[in-house]
């Protein structure tokens, strides 16, 4: 490995820069946080642990900004860095992030390969054996995900995935019996086992296992596991009776509200709204859906918004409030214009217009003037003033043309109408008005003002071969000679670096996501 003499800035400087980037992320300023992390990598460091942490945050911010390919790339850099220095706990966490990102990008084979690699990595290293239980649980969850998503069209292959999952669960149980250090949580094992039974259509056994998990989690004060167990039980084990599904979802929502994260509450409200709609409880379903919509906008969980808008629209149609339903249908249609779910919104506007036509006198035109009053955050004048006519819903192609027209109208600049008999503006009044506005702006400082400025240094211009092998790496030969590395990982990094050059400026793959599954926290390394 070719390294340079220059060691880069001291760790304290890099840590301060990293902290500045994380602060920006906490404030929701993800583009700025991304830029600060890129500056940090341009400065570079020879601290492998610190560099791995930088990669982790850069992957997270890319994931939040929907730069999925770049996020996956830097999670892989993170994993390689921690494998190099035999940091097994961080390697497990890195692999988990890679698996989640790969599954999100529908790269099941890649997720499976990394999960299997983690088992090999931990089982072949003396100090890594205590983490093999975590590796096996991760591999089991990947197999279940593949089975659930029908990545294998062949039924025999699906059975094989479930068989692998069962084998991994048995191996983890055996590991727990023989090891106290590194033992996997019993609730985690029971959740995986119950889901495996459900996907294998052993529903009665699955329900018993979920209930066993719930009882054990309550007894041991693991309340976060309780809401997960109730939700999974509703999703996988209660296959036919809506009463039991809704009951379990209510329990999941109760525990998530008290002990879970906001995104869990949103997910459960959204699902509860769907199931109550199926059960004919339209108004309560509508209220849960509206609450979920407000939280989705607040948290930026855009991956759920289409489903919630569709559920709300269906509820309002069932309640006979077609003008309000039309508003949410248009919102959903605009958001899903290039997606397969667009057709679902067309089907609802078709239902609403057919109902409106049946209740309209034959000598009058059937139309729906939009009513956005149920939406507390509505500020779209273009949609609010729109009137849906019967001919708009002739077919899905016609509706697509109408929605595209709305989108194009929204892009046009708003014309400023000149008021009649408008008096000329006095110059002194204008000066005093501008001065007053400037005073107001001085007293309302944005949160960004309190973030340290992004530093600039000539050090960032000094690029080394080690920096090109891994972004931000400025290795000092004296320091490297005294360190022990994982040879297999090092050889793989060097081999990959010959085939392609990693760059912060390479093209990103833009896909839909949500990204706040991990809390943004600063960890001192």
Curated annotation (Swiss-Prot):
Molecular function terms, GO-annotated: GDP-dissociation inhibitor activity
Residue ranges of the TM segments: none
Gene3D superfamilies: Tetratricopeptide repeat domain (1.25.40.10)
InterPro entries recorded: GoLoco_motif (IPR003109), TPR-like_helical_dom_sf (IPR011990)
Domain of life per record: Eukaryota
Cellular component annotations (GO), alphabetically ordered: aster; cell cortex; mitotic spindle
Consequences of knocking out this gene: Simultaneous RNAi-mediated knockdown of both gpr-1 and gpr-2 causes, in the 1-cell embryo, a decrease in nuclear and spindle movements during prophase, reduced asymmetric spindle elongation during anaphase and mispositioning of nuclei after cell division.
Keyword line: Cell cycle, Cell division, Cytoplasm, Cytoskeleton, Mitosis
Disordered: annotated segments: 489-525
Residues of the GoLoco domain: 424-445
Biological process terms in GO annotation: cell division; establishment of mitotic spindle localization; mitotic spindle elongation; nuclear migration; regulation of G protein-coupled receptor signaling pathway
Subcellular location: Cytoplasm, Cell cortex; Cytoplasm, Cytoskeleton, Spindle
Quaternary structure note: Interacts with gpr-1; gpr-1 forms a complex with lin-5 and GDP-bound goa-1.
Annotated function: In the 1-cell embryo, probably together with gpr-1, controls nuclear rotation and spindle elongation during mitosis. Complex of gpr-1 and gpr-2, in association with lin-5, activates G-protein signaling to affect mitotic spindle force. Polarity determinants (par genes) may regulate lin-5/gpr-1/gpr-2/goa-1 locally to create the asymmetric forces that drive spindle movement.
Protein name: G-protein regulator 2
Organism: Caenorhabditis elegans
Gene symbol of the encoding locus: gpr-2
């Amino acid at each position: 490995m070719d390294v340079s003499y220059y060691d880069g800035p001291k760790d304290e400087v890099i840590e301060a820069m990293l902290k500045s980037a994380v602060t920006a992320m906490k404030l929701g300023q993800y583009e700025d946080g991304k830029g600060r992390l890129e500056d940090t990598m341009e400065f570079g460091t020879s601290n492998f642990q610190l560099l791995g942490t930088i990669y982790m945050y850069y992957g997270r911010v890319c994931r939040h900004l929907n730069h999925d390919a770049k996020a996956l790339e830097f999670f892989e850099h993170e994993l390689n860095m921690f494998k190099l220095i035999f940091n097994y706990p961080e390697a497990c966490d890195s692999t988990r992030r890679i698996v989640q990102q790969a599954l999100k990008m529908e790269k099941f084979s890649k997720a499976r390969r990394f999960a299997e690699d983690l088992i090999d990595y931990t089982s072949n290293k003396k100090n890594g054996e205590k983490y093999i239980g975590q590796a096996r649980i991760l591999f089991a969850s990947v197999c279940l995900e593949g089975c659930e998503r029908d990545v294998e069209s062949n039924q025999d292959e699906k059975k094989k995935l479930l068989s692998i999952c069962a084998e991994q669960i048995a191996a983890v149980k055996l590991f727990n019996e023989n090891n106290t250090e590194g033992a996997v949580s019993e609730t985690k094992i029971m959740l995986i086992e119950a889901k495996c039974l459900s996907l294998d259509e052993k529903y009665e056994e699955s329900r018993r296992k979920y209930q066993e998990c719930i009882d054990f989690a309550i007894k041991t004060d693991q309340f976060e596991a309780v809401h997960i167990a109730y939700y999974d039980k509703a999703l996988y084990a209660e296959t036919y009776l809506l009463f039991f599904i809704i009951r379990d979802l209510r329990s999941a929502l109760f525990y998530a509200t008290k002990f879970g994260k906001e995104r869990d509450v949103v997910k459960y409200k959204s699902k509860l709204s769907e199931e109550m709609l199926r059960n004919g409880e339209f108004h309560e379903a509508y209220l849960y859906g509206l609450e979920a919509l407000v939280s989705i906008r607040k948290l930026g969980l855009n991956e759920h918004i289409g489903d919630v808008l569709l559920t709300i629209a269906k509820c309002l149609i069932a309640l006979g409030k077609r003008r309000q339903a039309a508003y949410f249908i248009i919102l959903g249609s605009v958001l899903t214009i290039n997606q397969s779910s667009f057709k679902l919104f067309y089907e609802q506007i078709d239902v609403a217009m057919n109902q409106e036509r049946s209740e309209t006198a034959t000598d009058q035109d059937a139309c729906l003037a939009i009513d956005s009053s149920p939406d507390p955050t509505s500020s779209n004048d273009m949609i609010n003033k729109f009137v849906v006519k019967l001919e708009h819903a002739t077919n899905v192609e016609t509706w697509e043309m109408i929605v595209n027209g709305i989108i194009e109208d929204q892009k046009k600049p708003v014309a400023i109408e000149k008021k009649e008999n408008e008096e000329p503006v006095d110059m002194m009044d204008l000066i005093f008005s501008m001065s007053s506005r400037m005073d107001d702006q001085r007293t309302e400082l944005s949160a960004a003002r309190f973030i340290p400025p992004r530093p600039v240094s000539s050090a960032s211009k000094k690029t080394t071969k080690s920096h090109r092998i891994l972004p931000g790496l400025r290795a000092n030969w004296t320091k490297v000679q005294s360190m022990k590395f994982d040879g297999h990982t090092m050889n793989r990094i060097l081999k990959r670096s010959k085939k392609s050059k990693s760059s912060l400026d390479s093209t990103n793959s833009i896909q839909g996501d949500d990204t706040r599954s991990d809390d943004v926290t600063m960890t001192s390394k």
